[in-house]
Amino acid sequence: FPRLEERQHQVASTLSGGEQQMLAIGRGLMSRPKLLLLDEPSMGLAPLLVKEIFNIVKAINQQGTTILLVEQNANMALSIADYGYVLETGRTVLHGPAQELAANEEVKAAYLGG
């Protein structure tokens, strides 16, 4: 997280939303977990920062950490996921490989704006 290195002496509460998300992810990685749980990492972020956060999440996964991602931005989540679950009122209504879910007409119509 090069951006955080530049701000290493800054109080966390004064960081931008994206920087705070990077800090939270970094703190979660400090114990070298096998599984990292992320709840809405894109919430409240500008689109450019959302893309950056998702690139970071993808890189963490590619380095061997399993990621459980809860995310309203279904397009972005499915673009980096291996597998996905679609929940409605707390129940799993669909699941499968992320590419299949992204191509599913029901999923497109209901969740992907298409």
Describe each region flagged by the PLM.
Residues 51-63:
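Helical segment within the ABC ATPase nucleotide-binding domain
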Residues 25, 45:
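Hydrophobic anchor residue at the start of the ABC signature
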Residues 32:
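Conserved catalytic motifs of ABC-family nucleotide-binding domains
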Residues 11-15:
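Conserved ABC ATPase signature
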